[in-house]
Amino acid sequence: MIELSHEEELRYNRQIILKSVDFDGQEKLKASKMLIVGLGGLGCAASQYLAAAGVGNLTLLDFDTVSLSNLQRQVLHCDARLNMPKVESAKIALEQINPHINIETINAKLDEEKLAEIIPHFDIVLDCTDNVEIRNQLDRQCNHMKVPLISGAAIRMEGQVSVFTYEPNTPTYRDLSKLFRQNVLSCVEAGVLAPIVGIVGCIQALEAIKVRLKIGKNLCGRLLMIDGFSMNIREIKLPTNME
């Protein structure tokens, strides 16, 4: 059984005093294994709060390197680490945030066969990518392995978050993508305002913790939509098995 050190008890005190977390929940977070796919704006925001919250084992997956245009919103990276693999840059920053956790990196673009090999080793997967092909691969494999997927997206001044637990009669990312039949733009094409990716990434981290600890009401079956321009936040119910 994994236990907290005295220093960790002090570090996580403000979470431990929450009745829904307590010592048992914090120890469960320490024992947890989460995969973060994409270390751009969403992944940077989500990973730093998961690290700070004491998720004991984070694996960072990305195949890109840090560029100057990333620094406007990808807050774990910096000028000194330009051209460094994003996973290595993020690891350096996260280890400074919390030296008590274990951080592994995968600097590669994994095909679906390789994703199928690694996903069963995790309790939660966070989809922080802007790549439709990878999103669909993660959805298929997480669905097959019944590993919860926390999905986020942000563009312009808009963001969205949903949770897929793959329990019976719950929607998948495939259902969501069918609901929004449209061409997917990237930040390169449409632009993005920095704070919106932080908001979405933080919500992803929050939902990951809630799902792992089985607390609160998570976003399974719902899509949270954030319009930063008008500061309007709404949700829609997602259909299941949409043809």
Swiss-Prot record:
This is Molybdopterin-synthase adenylyltransferase. GO terms for molecular function: ATP binding; molybdopterin-synthase adenylyltransferase activity; nucleotidyltransferase activity; sulfotransferase activity; thiosulfate-cyanide sulfurtransferase activity; ubiquitin-like modifier activating enzyme activity. Homodimer. Forms a stable heterotetrameric complex of 2 MoeB and 2 MoaD during adenylation of MoaD. Pathway: Cofactor biosynthesis; molybdopterin biosynthesis. CDD domains: ThiF_MoeB_HesA_family. GO terms for cellular component: cytoplasm; cytosol. It catalyses: [molybdopterin-synthase sulfur-carrier protein]-C-terminal Gly-Gly + ATP + H(+) = [molybdopterin-synthase sulfur-carrier protein]-C-terminal Gly-Gly-AMP + diphosphate. The keyword Transferase applies. Its EC number is 2.7.7.80. One of its GO terms (biological process) is Mo-molybdopterin cofactor biosynthetic process. Keywords: ATP-binding, Molybdenum cofactor biosynthesis, Nucleotide-binding, Nucleotidyltransferase, Transferase. It comes from the Bacteria. Gene3D superfamilies: NAD(P)-binding Rossmann-like Domain. The keyword ATP-binding applies. Catalyzes the adenylation by ATP of the carboxyl group of the C-terminal glycine of sulfur carrier protein MoaD. Belongs to the HesA/MoeB/ThiF family.
